[in-house]
Amino acid sequence: MRECISVHVGQAGVQMGNACWELYCLEHGIQPDGQMPSDKTIGGGDDSFNTFFSETGAGKHVPRAIFVDLEPSVIDEVRTGTYRQLFHPEQLISGKEDAANNYARGHYTIGKEIIDQVLDRMRKLADQCTGLQGFLVFHSFGGGTGSGFTSLLMERLSVDYGKKSKLEFAIYPAPQVSTAVVEPYNSILTTHTTLEHSDCAFMVDNEAIYDICRRNLDIERPSYTNLNRLISQIVSSITASLRFDGALNVDLTEFQTNLVPYPRIHFPLATYAPVISAEKAYHEQLSVAEITNACFEPANQMVKCDPRHGKYMACCLLYRGDVVPKDVNAAIAAIKTKRSIQFVDWCPTGFKVGINYQPPTAVPGGDLAKVQRAVCMLSNTTAIAEAWARLDHKFDLMYAKRAFVHWYVGEGMEEGEFSEAREDMAALEKDYEEVGLDSYEGEEDEGEEY
């Protein structure tokens, strides 16, 4: 079996986790108490969903997941919520005082008190797996726990499970709306620390998702529940191939192989279609060509940046539902003829396709309509550098005045870490710039470098 362990860190991670596991349970027909009426083999069994759920002798299905937060309130909601019987109490780990939006607290002072307990629990989960494939880490960049504790955890996971893939789903600070003033600091510190430990990071920006909710689902004031349910559909599409049998299956390592041309350039852009409310879906039939085209609209992206300003390095299309390869090939051929989509010249083909026959599931009482087919596109494009540039600029404005830095230094960080992290980010921007250059332009100055 190719099991995956999900780790949900901090408030954002835990709330995304709630939405994801709610959806997984609906997709597999697992009840909130962990029973699965449709599953005839009690205990074990080699069903595809066992990648995400372990099965007890009593026929209960337990998520292979850990929820961690440095303060109890968010996890207490899981402990008392609808799915309280789904999780093992030891899978929900909470500390007593929070990281107060401070990376240094999450990474050094408070994080280190809880890290061993978390790793211990991870080890137990990993021992239950026959062929652990990797970890999915859900967190935000802006919070103290999401940034600081995640980077600490990733460092430790690299030591303990060096060869296993580690994928991140990260909430990236939105360009306009902000939940904390020090978001740019936390984001840049965490990106710098986790860059070498993460194999692939899918970024999601709240503002982009707010806009999608407003525009496509007609929700005037989207709540975090609305946002998370939309994110969970994307996560579900990405992991569907691990949990169901399909025509063209994609496994975790396969994402990396196809999406990450260079180890540092591992930030694919996620796009999902169709995002449509029940009222509208009733009146239109969305063809494969239509949903494929929708994926190339900047409006449907999960991060605010414009791929028309960048070049694509790789592109992964994950279809689910009533889709046949013939339609997909036609849709891709049509897209390749459009000139607005530019690939880097060293990557001519660039489309990887996964097809899964399980149609997308709609959460009852949710905003998304039940549709016959959906697609999630993961593309590695140089345009995402815009997002980094935006963040770096905010960091520079604050750091020039050394604003708020004393909070970090007071928790045992050194100021040098800030400048080191910032230099790393500058290097990352440069990497993206160089990857986008045409290969023949870069030939003449090759001689000097080596």
UniProtKB/Swiss-Prot annotation:
GO cellular component, one term: cytoplasm
GO BP terms in the entry: microtubule-based process
Subcellular location, record wording: Cytoplasm, Cytoskeleton
Residues bound to GTP: Q11, E71, S140, G144, T145, T179, N206, N228
Top-level class of the enzyme under EC nomenclature: hydrolase
PTM comment text: Some glutamate residues at the C-terminus are polyglycylated, resulting in polyglycine chains on the gamma-carboxyl group. Glycylation is mainly limited to tubulin incorporated into axonemes (cilia and flagella) whereas glutamylation is prevalent in neuronal cells, centrioles, axonemes, and the mitotic spindle. Both modifications can coexist on the same protein on adjacent residues, and lowering polyglycylation levels increases polyglutamylation, and reciprocally. The precise function of polyglycylation is still unclear. Some glutamate residues at the C-terminus are polyglutamylated, resulting in polyglutamate chains on the gamma-carboxyl group. Polyglutamylation plays a key role in microtubule severing by spastin (SPAST). SPAST preferentially recognizes and acts on microtubules decorated with short polyglutamate tails: severing activity by SPAST increases as the number of glutamates per tubulin rises from one to eight, but decreases beyond this glutamylation threshold.
Domain of life per record: Eukaryota
Keyword check for Nucleotide-binding: yes
Keywords in alphabetical order: Acetylation, Cytoplasm, Cytoskeleton, GTP-binding, Hydrolase, Isopeptide bond, Magnesium, Metal-binding, Microtubule, Nucleotide-binding
Modified residues (5-glutamyl polyglutamate): E444
Protein function: Tubulin is the major constituent of microtubules, a cylinder consisting of laterally associated linear protofilaments composed of alpha- and beta-tubulin heterodimers. Microtubules grow by the addition of GTP-tubulin dimers to the microtubule end, where a stabilizing cap forms. Below the cap, tubulin dimers are in GDP-bound state, owing to GTPase activity of alpha-tubulin.
UniProt name for this protein: Tubulin alpha chain
Source organism of the structure: Notophthalmus viridescens (Eastern newt)
